[in-house]
Structures are given as C-alpha cells and as structure tokens.
C-alpha cells in the first residue's frame, strides 16, 4: 500500500487557518528567487505547481495566499499520521515527510477486502487530523504508488492481482518509475509511447540498444513486475544542503561563510544519527545557470564540522584553479534564460580554517551553493596513528558540549563567531532570527524519513514528488517482508 498526504503543507495551512479554505494557498520561499514547495489544489487550477519559481506563481495566481513553511508544525502532523498508520501495520517504509509504503499483506482478510482496509486507514487519519490522504493498494510498490496517484485528491484505488498489465497498458511511458524526460525522449524515438508498446516485447533485449542497463527494469515495470520489498529500516546514504541566494555571491569571504554554515548543519545532523561520512561534495551554480560539482573521499570517515568545511574549501579552490579563465565546459545548463556574467579578478581571502586554507573569489556571480556528505555508516573511525593531531579529539568534545546546549536551548541558541558573522556581518547573508530558525527547521525536518537535499534558502522543502523519484540516496533493506495482498 502507498499513502500520499495530499498537498500536505498547504492542507495543514488550510486546516490551521479556516479562512484559507477554498482559496489558493502556496507554500514556499517568499523571496524573489523563492520556489514553491507545494500548493493547494485550488492553486493548481491556475497552473501553479511544486518547484515553480515563486515569481512565476505570483504571475499565474496573483490573489493566492503565499505562506512561508512552518516545518515544526508539518513534522508534528506527519508524526501523528505515521503513528496512526502504525496502528494498522508495523511494516512502514517512509519515503518523505508526507509519503510512505505500508506492508499490509494478509490484513485485507480482517476487513471485507483491500478497499475496505484502505478506507479504514483513510477514515482514521481524517478522524484524528482532519486531513485527507490518497491511498493505492496493489501487488507491488510500483503499482501501489501509481494507484495512489490515479484519483487525487482523496483517492483510493486498488489494482488487484491479474490486472496489472491491463491497468498499465494505456498509460504513457513517463509513468514508469525512473523514466525522466531524456529517457522518455529516447524511448519515443524508438516507437515506445505507451506501456503496451513495451508489453508487446517478449523481453528487454530490444530496449538495450536504447536505454542500456535500464532495459530490464523498464521492461519489468511496464509489465507490472516489481520485486522490491517494503524496507522497514533503511540506510541513509547521503545528506546535503544547498541554498539559492536572493542576491548573487561575488565575494570569497561570503562563500567561505556559506560552506561553514552548511558544514555546521550537516555535522549536527550526522551526530544526531551517530553517522559518519566518507565523501564530501560541493555544488556551484553561476548566475547564468551553469552548474558544476566536485567531490573528495576522506581518508577517515567523519562527523566533524571542521573536516567538512576544510574539504569544501579545498574542493572550491581546486575548482577555481581549474577554471581561472572560463566557466566549466562540462557543466549542464538549465533551460532558464541566461543572465549577464561579470568577470572579476581572482584574489585570495584568508579563511578561518585551522589549516590556513585560503578562499578564492569566484570568476563570476554565484547563484547557488551546496554541500553534501555521502557514503554514510555507523562505523566509529579510529585514529590512524598515535601521532595524529589532537584536533579531532578536541573537536569531538566541543561538538558534544554544543550539541547538548542546543538540545536544551534550541538550534540557534549557540553560534560560533564565524556563523554569527554569516548572519550579521558585512560579508554574510543577513537574516532575522525567525528566518534562521525556519531555515534550520527546513534542513532537519526529514531526518527521520528519506535522505534529502534541502534548499534552506529559497525552496525550504524539497518537492515531495521529486523526492519520491530520487531514491538513489536510499539503499539496502535491513528488514524485509514478502508482499501478498
């Protein structure tokens, strides 16, 4: 069974503010570069959708109600709904703050059938929270997710055994999980427009020249075959944070402070889960939407801010040194219109890294920065030798004290001088304290769910439909159960 909480953030805003009921509600970053996190179905009638620039949404729906995300509240309601689902089954695989798979094999015998079971769960959620959800029941995860999306909002669709291919046959190939615009274009060029066209093939061999190693998965899903189990205990492979800036960054010191901020947030998230990361990567987007990334594997897995920060600076400077005269050729460009580029001379800024690493100015305005830590595990790293620097031990003790203080007095109660400068100094990104808290909340909201990258500046919360289609960051079941609806 797949459960999706319809227009979750917007629905909570309408629930908490009855005067919003029946009106278009748009939740997201409210700056000129903000992005829609989600919107009510009333807003969708105007063409507004998740991941749309807020400026575009305001043109389409000028009379809409625009709301800044309240992540504490959304997570509170999400926890309540997940608790309700646990009343029906202990086998739950969270996909995000508002979406999950439930293993309900055999449970339909306790009701008059699968549809009655789905109705019971939906009614229970509405009774306890006042919110509607959509549910899909099917023999496997792919079909269950597809079913939950067929009759939104407040949908309840059952795909019984034996009718998998019949239901899928008339649907476009873009409904296959993992088929994006590029793969869709390739398949269509090969004559495959609907799932029935793929179903007509005896096996995946005809697809291999088109999509390579994706062929078997695409053929199986088009035929309703999906053996993935519900994973009740999943390993998070990566965490990340990125921010789109209302004003482009052009100063090396400001960029340094941003990496310090990201490293601080990610290290805390790792320590809360007792995880260590093996790989650090940075993402850079210029004002013309040229985007490039670099990564480095650590000698020893870490959960420390200074390690992530220093590695980010090393990657940044390496990127700058590689491309001192022009933007990266290998970078992909978004389809958004290009902006003017202002070239500036490289200069060095002394950064606050304990290793004295210098931070270089960018070759042009920076629209977005991101930092990701991946290759996560629960292994506690050992010192390589007795002669290692005592810095890590000192940092561990300091981090433990700061974590304890923040758990008692809040995320923004204790702040290093560098982070204070980030929010209040001349080179930093000024924000009100309430905005800082919202940014922190947005970044940590899904720590108990799927691994996500959260844009703590403009997007605030990743689009849930996008998260559901990017499960590369989640790997390996720890506990699995066989499905037999």
Language-model-derived ranges and their functions:
Residues 8, 32-33, 287-290, 376-379:
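Short, charged/polar surface micro-motifs in flexible loops or helix N-caps
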Residues 106, 139, 286, 300, ...:
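Non-catalytic surface loops within mature trypsin-like serine protease
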Residues 100-106, 293-296, 378, 383-388:
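Short, hydrophobic beta-strand segments
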Residues 300-332, 337-344, 349-351, 355-457, ...:
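Acidic, metal-coordinating catalytic segment for phosphate/diphosphate chemistry
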Residues 1-218, 228-233, 268, 392-452, ...:
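Gly/Gly-Pro- and Ser/Thr-rich, intrinsically disordered tail segments characteristic of DNA damage-repair
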Residues 2, 175, 183-327, 337-339, ...:
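DNA-contacting surface of Y-family translesion DNA polymerases
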């Amino acid at each position: 069974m797949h459960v999706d909480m319809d227009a979750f953030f917007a629905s909570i805003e309408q629930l908490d503010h009855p005067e919003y009921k029946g009106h278009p509600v748009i939740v997201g970053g409210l700056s000129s570069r903000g992005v829609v996190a989600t919107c009510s179905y009333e807003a969708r009638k105007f063409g507004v959708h998740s991941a749309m620039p807020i400026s575009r949404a305001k043109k389409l729906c000028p009379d809409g109600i625009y709301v800044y995300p309240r992540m504490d509240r959304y997570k509170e309601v999400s926890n309540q709904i997940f608790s309700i689902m646990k009343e029906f089954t202990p086998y739950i695989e969270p996909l995000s703050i508002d979406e999950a798979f439930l293993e309900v094999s055999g449970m339909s015998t306790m009701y008059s059938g699968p549809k009655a079971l789905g109705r019971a769960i939906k009614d229970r959620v509405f009774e306890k929270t006042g919110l509607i959800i959509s549910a899909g029941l099917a023999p496997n995860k792919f079909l269950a997710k597809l079913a939950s999306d067929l009759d939104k909002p407040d949908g309840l669709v059952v795909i019984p055994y034996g009718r998998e291919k019949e239901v899928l046959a008339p649907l476009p190939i873009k409904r296959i999980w993992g088929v994006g615009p590029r793969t869709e274009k390739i398949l269509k060029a090969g004559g495959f427009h609907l799932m029935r066209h793929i179903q007509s093939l005896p096996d995946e061999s005809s697809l291999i020249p088109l999509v390579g190693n994706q062929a078997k998965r695409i053929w199986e899903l088009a035929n309703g075959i999906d053996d993935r189990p519900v994973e009740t205990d999943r390993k998070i492979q990566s965490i990340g944070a990125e921010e789109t800036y209302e004003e482009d960054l052009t100063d090396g010191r400001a960029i340094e402070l941003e990496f310090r901020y990201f490293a601080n947030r990610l290290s805390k998230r790792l320590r809360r889960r007792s995880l260590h990361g093996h790989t650090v990567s940075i993402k850079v987007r210029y004002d013309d939407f040229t985007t490039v990334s670099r990564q480095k594997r650590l000698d020893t897995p870490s959960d420390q801010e200074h390690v992530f920060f220093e590695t980010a600076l090393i990657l940044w400077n390496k990127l700058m040194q590689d491309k001192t005269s022009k933007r990266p050729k290998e970078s992909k460009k978004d389809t958004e219109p290009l902006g003017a580029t202002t070239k500036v001379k490289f200069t060095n800024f002394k950064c606050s890294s304990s290793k004295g690493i210098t931070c270089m100015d960018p070759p042009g305005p920076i629209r977005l920065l991101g930092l990701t830590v991946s290759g996560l595990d629960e292994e506690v790293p050992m010192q390589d030798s007795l002669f290692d620097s005592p810095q890590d031990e000192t940092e561990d003790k300091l981090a433990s004290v700061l974590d304890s203080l923040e758990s008692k007095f809040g995320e923004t109660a204790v702040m290093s001088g560098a982070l204070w400068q980030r929010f209040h100094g001349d080179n930093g990104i000024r924000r009100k304290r309430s905005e800082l808290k919202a940014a922190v909340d947005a970044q940590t909201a899904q720590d108990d769910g799927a691994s996500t990258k959260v844009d703590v500046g403009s997007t605030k919360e990743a689009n849930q439909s996008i998260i559901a289609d990017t499960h590369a960051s989640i790997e390996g079941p720890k506990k699995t159960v066989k499905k037999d609806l």
